[in-house]
Amino acid sequence: MYKAETRGIMVTVEPRFVEEESSPGESRYFFAYTVEIVNNGSEQVQLRSRHWRIIDGRGACQEVRGAGVVGKQPVLEPGESFSYTSGCPLTTPDGLMAGSYTMSTIGGESFEAEIPAFSLDSPHLRRVVH
């Protein structure tokens, strides 16, 4: 489990390899990740957008930006949380993801809440030791 906190917004990510959606012989590796966002702060916030950096095992980086998460822009009162699960296909058996959520306060102030960097590791990864 990976965690980061920014201005009272705790983001926890738990990734997993999804064998049934993967086809290693065709260089297709699918990963799911569950995110929990907890408002440990003292004011209401709303998740407005997301920004992901996805880096595969060869070092190729893809950036993804979009409004909200899974079609929602949740509002979190102090003490509330929101969880969702999404997925990421890669052409390599490993990689990593990191990013941020743009949050806004009830007063209209925006800030970036860090999504912790987390590794995507499949059992098909062959490690070479010299």
Curated annotation (Swiss-Prot):
* InterPro entries recorded: ApaG_domain, ApaG_sf, Uncharacterised_ApaG
Write one Pfam family the protein is assigned to.
DUF525
| Gene3D superfamilies for the chain | ApaG domain
Q: Name one GO biological process term.
A: error-free translesion synthesis
Top-rank taxon, per record? Bacteria
- Which NCBIfam families does the record associate with it? PRK05461.1
Protein name as catalogued:
Protein ApaG
What organism is listed for this UniProt entry? Methylorubrum extorquens (strain PA1)
Q: Taxonomic classification, please?
A: Bacteria, Pseudomonadati, Pseudomonadota, Alphaproteobacteria, Hyphomicrobiales
